[in-house]
Amino acid sequence: MDGAPVVAITGMTFHDLIGTRYQQGVDTTKLMQDVALYNVEVTGPEHAVLVTNRACRVALGDRGVAHLTVSKDTQMMRLATDKRSMGNPGARTSSSWMQVVNQPPLDQLRAAADALNSGRKVAILVGQGP
């Protein structure tokens, strides 16, 4: 992967036909498990709100693929008619997303530069972790 943030949304057959070898049925969650950092089957409109928020944050914050799959009948549901479960208190995240700044404070950067500049045989091993 090239580190681009991606939210992939795929469709599935009707929820009660999943896993029944229905015509052209594909387990898209399983299909995406090796490439997706976040991989969820959406079960209803309220669930879609939470997991879409999370998928966007994972894709942007971790710079990778987030995948949501939605059954055909779930796609036709209305948010206004769906109810949250008793365990779901509602919104859990901020309404805004802030990009992570991967830069040290200026004083630490200067201290590192001074340490490197004062060395006689300096070697730098650079890479980008996961």
Model-identified regions with their sequence ranges:
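N-terminal alpha/beta PP-like core and its mobile active-site loop of ThDP/TPP-dependent enzymes
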Residues: 1-130
